[in-house]
């Protein structure tokens, strides 16, 4: 049986990266929430 997680850096950046987050309103919400929380890493 094939596992669901097949790591791939390009896809990782494209779907969860900073620029991807900034593209949508909700993504910006995520970044701001993480800023408020004081996360060391805002995005992948």
UniProtKB/Swiss-Prot annotation:
The name of this protein is Large ribosomal subunit protein bL34
Which GO MF terms does the UniProt record name?
Answer: structural constituent of ribosome
Q: Which Gene3D superfamilies match?
A: 1.10.287.3980
Write down any Gene Ontology CC term. Answer: ribosome
PROSITE patterns in alphabetical order: RIBOSOMAL_L34
PANTHER family linked to this entry: LARGE RIBOSOMAL SUBUNIT PROTEIN BL34M, MITOCHONDRIAL RIBOSOMAL PROTEIN 34 FAMILY MEMBER
Q: Which family does it belong to?
A: Belongs to the bacterial ribosomal protein bL34 family.
Which species is this record about?
A: Nitratiruptor sp. (strain SB155-2)
